[in-house]
Structures are given as structure tokens and as C-alpha cells.
Amino acid sequence: MPAELKLLWDEVRLAFADVDLILHSGDIVHPMVLDQLEAWAPVVAVIGNNDVYVRDDRVALTQWLDVDGFRIAMVHDMEPEDEPIDELRRKYLRGERPDVIVTGHTHYERMDFRDGVLQVNSGSPVHPHLWSTRLGTVALLDLEPGSLRAKIVKLGDTEGRRNPGVEYTFDGSTVHPLD
């Protein structure tokens, strides 16, 4: 892991300090990233377009999870993200209906609630908006039976490089941008 990335990694670790599961939405680049994340919590991941050298049983093109009564679908690239949910389901999820869709690819954070589906792109913790290495954003899902909450949080600023991220919260029915 590059030294510059190691300096940022502590902020990522703090953000995931109390999580039960880590969902990685692709652009893993190297399996050691999964190894590091797995030291903190179990990891479920999807393959990204920058993962040509990642050959790992923990990674798939699409992942489906059932957590506390909620169905979560993960896929790296689901563009355009603002297409109707039914069209995204048809094109990327074989028509299956999740409660939550977790995506990546753009490195731009996004949270939307449409047609009863929460759509989350966490951005990137260390390469936000495809800028040079710096702190960015992560998404946190809080799932309990009958209750779904989510937020996208900024990890801070890297010295000399601002964090371009936008924070969001989801209270179970509405997404609120915080910036």
C-alpha cells in the first residue's frame, strides 16, 4: 500500500469502527485492500472496472444480501444512476427488486430514494471524484428489522487538498443533503 494511502487509512478505520459488515462497491485494485478491511469486519465486494488483476473468491459481479429483513443489491457500475429504478433493475439486476442498491464506479457520492428503493453510491474514501489521493466519503447503513437509515459522511480534509464530498442522511423516507 502506498505510504500516502496508509496515512489516510486510519480515517477509514475510524469510520468503520463500529460496523458489522463492510460493503465494497468495486475498484478494489488489490486484494490486500479486502484483507485490511476484513481485519475490521466481514467484507462483501463487487468487481470494479479497475480490478482487472483482482482474482478473489470474496468478489463477484453482483452481490445480493438479506440483512434484518432488507434486500441489498450491489453492483459496481449502474449508469446512468438517475435512470428510472425499474429500468436499472431490468438492466443490471435481472428485474429483481431490492430495498437498497449499493453502487460505485463514479467515485461521486450519491444517495437517492425513489420508488421505494434506497440507492447509495458512497463515493470513495481515498479517491473522491477521481481526484488525486485524499480523504473522501463513506456510506453507513443502519439496518434493524423494520428500520433503514443511512448516511454518507466526509472523512475530513487531507492537508493541502480539500475533501470535495457532500454529506447526506436518509431517515427512512427522505434523503437530506447536509452541505
For the regions a protein language model found, what residue spans apply to each?
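Active-site environment of divalent metal-dependent phosphoester hydrolases
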Residues: M1-E4, V29-V33, N50-D56, E79-I85, ...
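N-terminal active-site segment of His-dependent metallophosphoesterases
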Residues: M1-V43, V52-A60, G69, R134-L135, ...
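Divalent metal-coordination and catalytic microenvironments
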Residues: I22, D27, L37, G48, ...
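Conserved beta-sheet core of the metallophosphoesterase superfamily
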Residues: V44, E83-K151
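Helix-adjacent hinge/juxtasegments
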Residues: V44-R97
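Residue-level recognition of conserved beta-strand positions in structured domain cores
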Residues: H76-D77, I152-K154
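A short, polar/proline- and glycine-enriched secondary-structure boundary/capping micro-motif
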Residues: E83-E87, W131, T158-Y168
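Non-catalytic terminal accessory segments
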Residues: S147-R149, D157, G165-D179
